């Protein structure tokens, strides 16, 4: 399946995702389960037959994901390779599409290209972007910045499920700015 779906957003990729809980949908389903009066049939239909909504922010993210991948490969990890949709063989109803994998290091890559990166530096995105502040925590220690993901955000769940599916213990979650062709890395460990 991973080879057949290497081109994310292909018809095969969409088909494989439509019949499974995915890394990107799991948090929405988990938090929905706490709803006092859930309409599961309606909720599941959102995943089986998703409406194709492509905002300018989503178009921007898709447009610059390849640039981000190449920048990461050049500056941080030349062993990273693309992969398609991968299912967890022990639990074939769940799967994920990490943006890359380094099988030698047991590491996956997840890329985010916030729209604010079109006109702003990576420093600005980290320190000022209200969208980024929802999922990124910045701690300063002895003048060094340390980044972590908010555990109560969909991106954290997405990364964790992708690591579980790929049987990897680590992830590099990158936030990319096309303005300066640069990124920051949030190193994420698998949370058993």
Model-derived features: where do they sit?
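Nucleic-acid nuclease catalytic cores
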Residues: 76-98, 104-192
């Amino acid at each position: 399946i991973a080879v057949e779906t290497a081109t994310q957003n292909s018809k095969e990729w969409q088909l494989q995702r439509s019949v499974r809980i995915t890394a990107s949908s799991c948090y929405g389903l988990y938090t929905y389960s706490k709803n006092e009066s859930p309409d599961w049939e309606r909720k599941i239909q959102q995943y089986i037959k998703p409406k194709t909504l492509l905002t300018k922010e989503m178009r921007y993210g898709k447009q610059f994901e390849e640039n981000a991948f190449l920048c990461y490969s050049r500056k941080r990890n030349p062993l990273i390779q693309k992969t398609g949709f991968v299912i967890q063989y022990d639990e074939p109803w769940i799967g994920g599409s990490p943006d890359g994998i380094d099988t030698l290091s047991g590491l996956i890559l997840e890329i985010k290209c916030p729209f604010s990166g079109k006109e702003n530096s990576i420093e600005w995105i980290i320190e000022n972007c209200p969208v980024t502040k929802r999922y990124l925590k910045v701690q300063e220690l002895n003048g060094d910045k340390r980044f972590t993901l908010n555990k109560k955000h969909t991106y954290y769940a997405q990364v964790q499920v992708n690591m579980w599916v790929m049987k990897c213990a680590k992830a590099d979650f990158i936030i990319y700015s096309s303005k300066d062709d640069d990124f920051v890395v949030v190193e994420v460990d698998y949370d058993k």
